[in-house]
Every structure is written in C-alpha cells, then in structure tokens.
C-alpha cells in the first residue's frame, strides 16, 4: 500500500506540446492514463499546469510587454491547458474540475476554494489548478507549492524532461550523476535549481516532500513511484 493518500502533480505547459500541436491530443490521453493509474491505487490527485506551450510571461516581457500584463497572459495560457486536460478526462470517464487562481466568469471554471477542493478530492474527482497563485511575479512552481499546502497533499511530484536531479546538466554532461534523495539543506547548499526560491522555501517550511521525475517517456513511472520504487529524486527534510 502506498504511503501517499493525496498528491499534487506539477506539469509544465511544454509537456503538452508536440512538434505539430501546441496541445497534443496523444499527450493529453497519456496524461489521463497516468491519472487513472493513480486513482486506481486509491490515491487522490490534483494537478498544477503551466502555460509555456502557449505563452510564458517571462518571455513576453522581452518583446516589450509590461511584466504584469505578460504574467496575466501567461496565467490565461494555463487556463487553456487546464480546460484541455479536464475535457480529455471527462471523455475518458474521469471526473475533473478546473479551479483557477484568477476569477473567470461564464461558467468556464471555478475559483479556487481549498475547502471545496478537498471535498471534491475525497469524492474521487481530479482537481486541475491553473493561473498559478493568481498573482503576477510568481511562477507556477510557487503556485504548485501553495496549492499542495492548501489541499494538504503528502507530496509534490514534479514532472520534468529528465529523470531526476543531477550533479550537473545530464544533457550537456554525460558523466553527471543522479541523486536518489536529497535534503532541503543539501539542495540549497549545492545550489540545485529544483524550483524557484519562493516555491522551495514554502516546501521546506511546510515539510512538503518533492519528487522530481520524468513522466511521459514511461507512463508507468508515477504509478511505480507511488508503489515505492526508487525512481527520480526525492527531496525531503
């Protein structure tokens, strides 16, 4: 039996894209299969999605757009991604609910309410959080840390392009070694860029475990991690 009862999965927006599609339907279905595998273990799951496949606020500022406006555009991009994931969930008979850090009218999605979110998770629904913290100048990593704390998640599972945290960039350095586990203090001391400083500080303060792993190459990876297999890198106190 897994030690996890409720998890938060952090996905980048880029993970949804392919060479031909901003939002790739094959990838969406893979993500839903992964969600199903988590639910089949009687583990509750919430997701925080980025928007970098559409617009990234930090990138837009380089074009001359005001930083605050750029971040708002980036947050709207995450809402688009969340709706796409939720729609694919519903098509596959997975009950999903989108909750946004920005107030969006017209019945498009719900505003974030941590009490309602926890109640929905207990009923087996998947919560897809979007729009980060709802404020500019914060990353979706910080949004993930905040939402995980709000819903009382046991851990954040951060899906990345590589299968964990390494001593160096494994793409540039083939001799880089992967860490199986790290303490928060070790990660800070070694200056390992796991999350931005604000997100990492929140996780450390609230003793919120972080697992960094690669998800889409093998759709069983998250399920295997939840069963206790030593994959990726765990960061804890």
Curated annotation (Swiss-Prot):
Which locations, inside or outside the cell, does it occupy?
Cytoplasm
Spell out the molecular function terms from Gene Ontology.
ATP binding; UMP kinase activity
Q: Which residues make up the binding site for UMP?
A: 51, 71, 133-140
Q: Where does this protein chiefly localize? A: cytoplasm
Q: Which reaction does it catalyse?
A: UMP + ATP = UDP + ADP
Q: Which residues form the signal peptide?
A: none
Give the Enzyme Commission number.
2.7.4.22
* Protein name per Swiss-Prot or TrEMBL: Uridylate kinase
**Stated family:** Belongs to the UMP kinase family.
Task: Fetch the CDD domains from UniProt.
Answer: AAK_UMPK-PyrH-Ec
- Which GO CC annotations does the UniProt entry carry? cytosol
Q: Which gene encodes it?
A: pyrH
- Report the record's Gene Ontology biological process terms: 'de novo' CTP biosynthetic process; UDP biosynthetic process
Q: What does this protein do?
A: Catalyzes the reversible phosphorylation of UMP to UDP.
What's in the keyword line of the UniProt record?
ATP-binding, Cytoplasm, Kinase, Nucleotide-binding, Pyrimidine biosynthesis, Transferase
Record lineage: Bacteria, Pseudomonadati, Pseudomonadota, Gammaproteobacteria, Candidatus Pseudothioglobaceae
Q: List the pathway annotation.
A: Pyrimidine metabolism; CTP biosynthesis via de novo pathway; UDP from UMP (UMPK route): step 1/1
UniProt source species: Vesicomyosocius okutanii subsp. Calyptogena okutanii (strain HA)
* Binding, ATP: 10-13, 52, 56, 160, 166, 169
Complex and partners: Homohexamer.
How is it regulated at the activity level?
Answer: Inhibited by UTP.
């Amino acid at each position: 039996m897994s030690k996890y009862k409720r998890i938060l999965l952090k996905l980048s927006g880029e993970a949804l894209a392919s060479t031909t599609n901003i939002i790739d339907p094959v990838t969406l279905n893979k993500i839903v299969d992964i969600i199903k595998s988590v639910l089949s273990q009687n583990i509750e799951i919430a997701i925080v999605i980025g928007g970098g496949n559409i617009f990234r606020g930090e990138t837009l500022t380089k074009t001359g757009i005001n930083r605050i406006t750029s971040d708002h555009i980036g947050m709207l991009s995450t809402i688009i991604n969340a709706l796409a994931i939720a729609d694919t969930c519903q098509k596959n008979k997975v009950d999903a609910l989108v909750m946004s850090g920005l107030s969006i009218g017209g019945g498009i999605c719900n505003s974030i309410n941590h009490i309602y979110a926890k109640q929905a998770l207990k009923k087996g629904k998947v919560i897809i959080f979007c729009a980060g913290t709802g404020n500019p100048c914060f990353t979706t990593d910080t949004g993930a840390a905040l939402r995980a704390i709000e819903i009382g998640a046991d851990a954040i599972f951060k899906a990345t392009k590589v299968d964990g945290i390494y001593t160096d960039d494994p793409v540039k350095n083939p001799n880089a070694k992967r860490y199986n586990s790290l303490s928060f203090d070790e990660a800070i001391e070694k200056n390992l860029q796991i999350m931005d400083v604000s997100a990492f500080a929140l996780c450390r303060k609230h003793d919120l475990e972080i697992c960094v792993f690669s998800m889409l190459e093998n759709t069983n990876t998250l399920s295997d991690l939840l069963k206790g297999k030593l994959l990726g890198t765990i960061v804890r106190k």
